[in-house]
Amino acid sequence: MKLDPKALRYLSKDDFRTLVAVEMGMKNHELVPVSLICTIANLKYGGTKKSIQTLHKFKLLFHDGRNYDGYKLTYLGYDFLALKTLVSRGVCSYVGNQIGVGKESDIYIVANDDNQEMVLKLHRLGRVSFKTIKNNRDYLKHRKSASWLYLSRLAALKEFAYMKALYENGFPVPTPIDYNRHCIVMSRARGYPLTQIVQLRHPSKVYSDLMNLIVKLASYGLIHGDFNEFNILINDEEEITLIDFPQMVSTSHLNAEMYFDRDVTCIRVFFEKRFNFIGERWPKFKDCQNIHSLDVEISASGFTRDMEKEFQDLSKQQDDDEINNNDSDENDEDDDEDDDDDDENNDDDENNDNNIENENEENIKKSSKVNKKEVGKEIKKEEEENNNSEEEDEEEEEEEDSDSEESVEDNTPVIEEFKGLSLNKNRDFKFSNLKDEDQNAPIVLRKEFIENLDENQPTEPKKEKVELTEEEKQRRKEEKRQKMITDKVKRQLGKTMREKVSVRNNVKSRTKKEVQAHISSY
């Protein structure tokens, strides 16, 4: 979204108060309801709803009423909040043209009351070209999700911290002035992007300066991570200025060597393609030495508090291991003496164990005698119960058999005959029952059956064909020809006279004589 600060002059204090209320509500709401905005803004006489309408008119708020009536900040509204704060601090007073666009930021020229030109960088994460920010950067850390505005704010904070630390340590970077939310104000570096340079007077000097800069960053415990021709500015004196720092990582990162080699190869490949310069030497990550711990001061990616604790724990373990190794020889001699004492103690323990086992066996025998008597009584009871149950089951089975015999006698099949056909023979059909039926019954095929039906039906007398004479044939041909001609003429007349209503009426009013005269012309 392009920054258009013209609407700043039309916004009142209540409007900015409402914007701040929406920003506060977005900490735990994706869409802030209107009721919450009113309570946070705390304006009188329904002024919040009026200011919401004006902010929505200038596209500073986004409205979504699908689930409930809610609003959220747009990037333009976030820009206005940051600019309002920077103006109140006296950092900038004028906003100029846009001088650069990147995959994650927009760059504008601003000026203060003294007409000193500066650069305003607005971070805009979440664009189509760079939506993998959550996977490629560690802004979220332990959080699962966050809004793009919050991620842009973290990126700006991180870049300002890196820029300030590098500037204080003498690196060729722009001068950091101030920041607020997702905006950074820095001095304007005089130069051109290296990607726009076609020819250099001293390519070897520039190449060596860039490689020395990579090594110097590594000596301070930092790796740029995106050291290419798009993030390097060069002036007319071939002096270098480094920009764009949110992706910097520490040399203690797990993939530090990969990032370091990638920065080196980017410069080598660019100089070879653009200036036909092949560097004979280039730095390697193994040769770099950490002289300063700048990554710890600014908490660069890859070196966190947990890593500091782990480093301290490892150092303590190493010290303990060294002490244990020194004492191991003395402990070996003491172990031999202890082994002899352990053998004597083991003999005494075996005697005690044997006595305990004998006592346990006697107790088990006594308990087994008592248990046998009780088990015998229980077995007798179970046998008596089983005998009684078997007798009862036999009596029930006899009663069921007698009932089934009576039901069979009562349910004897009654065969009713209708025109010599038994009705219930189809239920229990068997091939053996075919003997009872007439085996000499004729078998009639479908074809014979149909022929018999045709013979029985009455036949109509056939009409005799009447042969036509030649005169009648010619007369019929003439009639067909005349009919075809009349149809053709009517169709043509209908096509030509169809567009105009008056002509159509004239065609309908024509007499038969005119039509016949037209037909005779053929």
Curated annotation (Swiss-Prot):
It is found in: Cytoplasm; Nucleus. Its cofactor is Mg(2+). PROSITE patterns: RIO1. SUPFAM superfamilies: Protein kinase-like (PK-like) (SSF56112), Winged helix' DNA-binding domain (SSF46785). Residues 93-248 form the Protein kinase domain. ATP binds at residue 121. The keyword Nucleus applies. Residues 313-435, 452-484 are annotated as: Disordered. Its main location: cytoplasm. CDD domains: RIO2_C. GO terms for molecular function: ATP binding; metal ion binding; protein kinase activity; protein serine kinase activity; protein serine/threonine kinase activity. One of its GO terms (cellular component) is preribosome, small subunit precursor. It catalyses: L-seryl-[protein] + ATP = O-phospho-L-seryl-[protein] + ADP + H(+); L-threonyl-[protein] + ATP = O-phospho-L-threonyl-[protein] + ADP + H(+). The active site is at residue 226. Residues 371-383, 425-435, 460-484 have a biased composition (Basic and acidic residues). Its EC number is 2.7.11.1. Component of a late pre-40S ribosomal particle. Required for the final endonucleolytic cleavage of 20S pre-rRNA at site D in the cytoplasm, converting it into the mature 18S rRNA. Involved in normal export of the pre-40S particles from the nucleus to the cytoplasm. Belongs to the protein kinase superfamily. RIO-type Ser/Thr kinase family. This is Serine/threonine-protein kinase rio2.
